[in-house]
A protein has these predicted regions:
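Zinc-dependent deaminase catalytic domain
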Residues: 1-163
């Protein structure tokens, strides 16, 4: 009998790999990312960066950039044509009447503030992010306050175009 457990990924590695694959469906090249929500080692829902149904995607119509001014006074450009992978996954669960209470969310980078509020609101209890997000300090504080466990696998900030 052959022992293949040495080459077998952990559950977290498995779900992070699938999350990357889901991200291949993303339609904004600034942040092609995916999201998987899991409960009891079963996938509950997935999401990727994309426009709402019936609206043009960045890949088709180009980016819809808006300026954002950070608290420190620096300005950044943000594409607002699409919704984030985490938002899309939560919307998919809502459309199908699926509770996310007590589940784990896998994502490419730490969630933004808006995604963090949604994650808290739907009862997700753990977030596993592949990398750090450049503006995640408030998310970290919110998760700590809400009792959500945040695990960042790689101690590296995700880099993307026009960050």
């Amino acid at each position: 009998m052959v022992d293949d457990t040495a080459n077998r990924p952990s559950w977290d590695e498995y779900f992070l790999g699938l999350m990357d694959e889901v991200g291949n469906r993303a339609t904004c090249d600034r942040g092609r990312s995916g999201c998987i929500v899991v409960r009891d080692k079963q996938i509950v829902c997935t999401g990727y960066v994309g426009s709402p149904p019936g609206f043009p995607h960045c890949d088709e119509a180009g980016h819809l950039m808006k300026g954002v001014i950070e608290e420190d006074g620096t300005s950044r450009m943000h594409c607002v044509r699409t919704i984030h992978a985490e938002q899309n996954a939560i919307c998919q669960a809502a459309r199908h009447g699926i509770s996310l209470k007590g589940s784990t969310l896998y994502c490419k980078m730490e969630p933004c503030r808006v995604c963090a509020m949604l994650i808290i609101s739907v009862g997700i209890t753990k977030v596993i992010a592949k990398k750090k997000y450049h503006a995640a300090q408030e998310t970290r504080e919110m998760f700590k306050h809400a009792g959500i466990e945040l695990v960042v696998v790689e101690d590296v900030v995700e880099q993307y175009e026009r960050q």
